[in-house]
Curated annotation (Swiss-Prot):
It comes from Acidianus two-tailed virus. Residues 553-620 form a coiled coil. Residues 109-548 are annotated as: Disordered. Residues 129-142, 467-481, 512-531 have a biased composition (Polar residues). Residues 169-184, 212-223, 287-300, 324-336, 425-448 have a biased composition (Acidic residues). Residues 224-238, 271-283, 301-323, 453-466 have a biased composition (Low complexity). The lineage of its organism: Viruses, Viruses incertae sedis, Bicaudaviridae, Bicaudavirus. This is Putative VWFA domain-containing protein ORF892. Residues 723-892 form the VWFA domain. InterPro entries: VWF_A, vWFA_dom_sf. Keywords: Coiled coil. The keyword Coiled coil applies. Signal peptide: none annotated. Residues 143-162, 185-196, 536-546 have a biased composition (Basic and acidic residues).
Amino acid sequence: MSVDQDVVDEAYQYYAEDKRQISDKARKFIEFIDPILRKYSKLFRYYQNFAKFTLEYYYKLFYPFLEKLPENVVEDLKRQIINEIMSNPNQSIRDVLAKAVQKEAQRIEEQLQRRPQRAKQQPQKTKTSEVANQRVSRSAENQGKRGNEEKQQQKTPGKTEEASGAEQESGEEGNQQEESGEEQEGVKGSRSKQREEQEEEVSESEGKQSEESGESESEEGQSSEETQLSSSGEGNQQEEGKGGEGEGAETEEGGRRGEAESEQEEGEETGNGQESSGEAQNGGESGESEGEITESESASEEQTGSKGKSGQQGEEGQQQSGSEGEEGAEQEESGEEGNQQEGVGKQKKRSSRGQESEAGEEPGSAPEETQLSSGEEEAGQESGGETGSEQGFGEEGEQGQESETTGKQKGKKREATESGGGAESESEEGQSPEETQEGGEGGAETEEGGQGSEAEGTAAEGEVGQPSEQGVSSSTGSGQRSEGSEASEEQNAGESGEGSESEGAESIAGEQTGSSSESAGSEQLGSQQGELSLEEGGRGYAHGDEDLLSSPQEINSILQTLSQLRDTVQQLRNYDFYSNAIDERTFDDQNVSEHRKEKEIENLYDTANNVQKLLKDLNVSEGEQNKILQELVTQYSLRRLLGNIATKYKGLLDFVRNKGESEVESRHGSGKGPSSTMGDDLSRLFIKEYAKLSNPIQQKMFLLDYLNGALSIHKSEEKKQGDFLFVIDSSGSMEGNKIATALAIPLVTYKKYKGKRNILVETFSDEPSPIYNIKNIANVLGSMKFGGTNIGSAVLYALKNIDKPDSDYDRKLRESLRKTRTLILLTDGEDEIPDDIAREINSLKKKNKVELLCYGIDLGERGLKTLKEICDEVYAVGSNNFGNIVLKRLVH
């Protein structure tokens, strides 16, 4: 059941200049509010009145906001309102609206908070679809290259050692890593060896880049730049990164690189045959995930840069580090080893993530970074992994020494941990894909500063590695996971060892790249991935677990609109001082003090002073407000009435209690006690109607019902206003038409009142005749005498019988005389009334509360002046129309 159109028209009559223009808006609003009205109106007697009021009051309150909200949000808001009403139907609609809007805003805010996680879980759908496609193609190419590189690596494992020069240790490590990679390939797959061989080849070709990549990867264990470098040059850089990690281990363990190589070899052999200590885990991971990495090098390159590619990167990094310089590479590798060692435990924790990422969770870790890094890594491989590794390591070279010291210290720790799984390289490899990307992008730029960038990365790892590993892993480690889930993943990472390292490095890289730099940008990027994907990938606001709007701007707009609506509704709380409402139970309770009763009625008086505020809430025009105020406050004296209640409430309360509780029930149709009626007579208003003034919602109802005459009032008792006594002049001058008209007047009056009031008739001339009921018209006619005119004696006789009826009259006539309150004199004669008779007449009138109406038929000024001495009202009428004049006065 919808609201009728006439209700709509009435609801908007105050401000609808053209009803046709507003009809569409009105209908839309009614469709929104009608289900709410039908639920809430059960508490009210008249749905139509409540609908009018609600539409009147909330149209401008709600509609401007409804226009801004999507339809599904409007539907949710409607459900919230109805749920609030059904949960507590006794609360005011103001509270209902405030709570419903608040809950809807909170629900959207919660979904907005959950959205970044969802965005991280499915980032490739929104941002990196192209990159993913490129990765697939590049991964195929890289696989082909790796096949060749593996063969070359098998042929030239010693060349890497020779190319390393003083970094022969790293070269040996590269060979060992290659061998260990082969072993891992044997155990886990040939992919890690292929990557190692590719890394060695790339490292030989890139030389310094491999060192930088190794350093970057070692730093990647700590810094996101290294992971980015390794990932950006996955074909070269990732392999180099892993090689760098391996070199980091090698440099520390044997001439920092040679040692790292030996350790990596041992780590590979002991740590699942991984390439390096860092690669031991990474190698294991790479061995496990190399299949995945080779399949999707871009995705795996990001994490394989921290995982499977770490083996190849370790070899390449070793070879490149060998070409770059034993010292810089060794320092970088030592820093990397320290970082790797630091990242060992962390990477172990993250290894679970890394494995997950390797298994396809790589996009989950840092989808944007992995995609970008993979794209950049592929580009770096195509352009030459050297550039990626070189750029990535350029900045690290400065901090390489510092990171070396820290890396060495950490490397010692990691050596112990490397035997358990060599998570160091994984931490390096776990660096964020942004680092690999950045490394791939800036590889050529930092070729010269490859060692510096590596050192810088290691320094970042040494400085930020530990905290960033934890924080970043949680923030960006999985890219989708929350901090808590990431922490749990880190714990699980210790078990999986390999996968989490890549994610851990990615997360570390995220923290280090949080400031948009390689070391700081990834953190912000990781944290912003959800927002970025939200901007690009959302498909609009949806219910339940579905995605939100396509952009945070739209969501913020909705939240802002709901906030404005919530504030608007809550502004009604300014009327909370009305809460001390007059409560009928308070006055029925004998234990309530008189002071409290008086105080509550004073609150009612205060409401009258705020009528103007209430009218403003109705959104009526200023002219209409003034009109209503004038009617309520001035003409009907609402304020004075409430003031009188405050001072004389006892009489009112007695009146209400005398009527009984059933009287109040009668307004709800109980049928008990005296019936009630609808009207605007405030003197007979039920006290519960006054209680409406305590609530801002019901205040409007009170005003609307008052204007429409729909207030519940006591049905007045049918009090008889008294009988009529006609004193008719029957002198000779009244003969003819005058006397006939004069006798017809009481007959018509009797017929009008249908016996509810007795009509008595007395005729007079020189003397008054007996008084008869008009029903005995024959006796009236028989008593008529046509003679002179003695007005004074006739009126005095009638008043004396009203005061004390003659005993000769029957009982009914005497009772009727006692109830007579109106005396009507019809005469056309002029007479002098003595003063003593005039005084007695006036005295009896006052005593018996009798009203004397005198009609002078064709009388002159002198005759009218005589009548004014005794009459309350004197009318000069003509003989042709006096009948109608008298009847109009008496009947209407």
